A protein has these predicted regions:
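Auxiliary tRNA-acceptor-end handling modules of aminoacyl-tRNA synthetases
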Residues: 35-54, 77-188
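Ubiquitin-like/PB1-type beta-grasp interaction modules and other compact soluble beta-rich domains
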Residues: 1-62, 66-67, 71-84, 95, ...
């Protein structure tokens, strides 16, 4: 099998305004560009300006904030609140006040460094160990009810998140965003 990302070659040089491919439908199923595919698969590229592409963009931004939060506040638990227009509201579990400047600097540096969003498969025990260590109680409950032998996670640096939908293959595409304090939490 081959990785879709290798088929695209120069894709990482494209920017936000180039409407690059950001995911693919492989044999009828939406997949990340890092997904390994069978040799004879039917592939339809998904572009950034499509509905699915915009969803991947927003989900990648959310994961980037989660990554920045683990760098700035390794002992805090970031909670995803609700959507607010085109943005998302986040807060910390114990209502700690965020330092928006520190979070934004980490996010900007990750984009500047073009960190890769990797896909990683963890055994059930590895996944449970990670979510327990990070005090992700809801994710822990979910993994225990699914009872799978392995789970797919997205990774940026040391930050992991269960993979539900494709994310952008590269943070360099995150050109249009902002973060601000709102209601004691964070608006992304």
């Amino acid at each position: 099998s081959a990785r879709i990302v290798y088929l695209l070659g120069k894709q990482r040089k494209l920017g936000y305004h180039d409407n690059p491919p950001v995911a693919a439908v492989v044999n009828g199923e939406l997949k990340s560009l890092q997904t390994e595919i069978p040799e004879n698969a039917v592939i339809d590229l998904v572009y950034l300006n499509s509905k699915e592409g915009r969803t991947a963009y927003r989900k990648t931004l959310c994961f980037l904030l989660s990554y920045a939060s683990t760098v700035v506040y390794p002992d805090r638990t970031l909670l995803v609140g609700h959507s607010l227009g085109d943005g998302y509201y986040f807060s910390y579990k114990n209502k700690e006040k965020p330092d928006i400047d520190k979070l934004k600097k980490v996010m900007e540096k990750a984009i500047e460094d073009d960190l890769i969003v990797d896909i990683e498969t963890l055994s059930a025990s590895q996944a449970l160990t990670y979510v327990e260590k990070m005090k992700l109680k809801d994710t822990e409950k979910l993994l225990k009810t699914r009872n799978d032998g392995a789970y797919t996670f997205n990774r940026i640096g040391s930050a992991l998140s269960v993979s539900y939908e494709p994310l952008l293959p590269s943070l360099k595409l995150l050109e249009v965003w902002d973060i601000m304090e709102y209601g004691g939490g964070i608006l992304l």
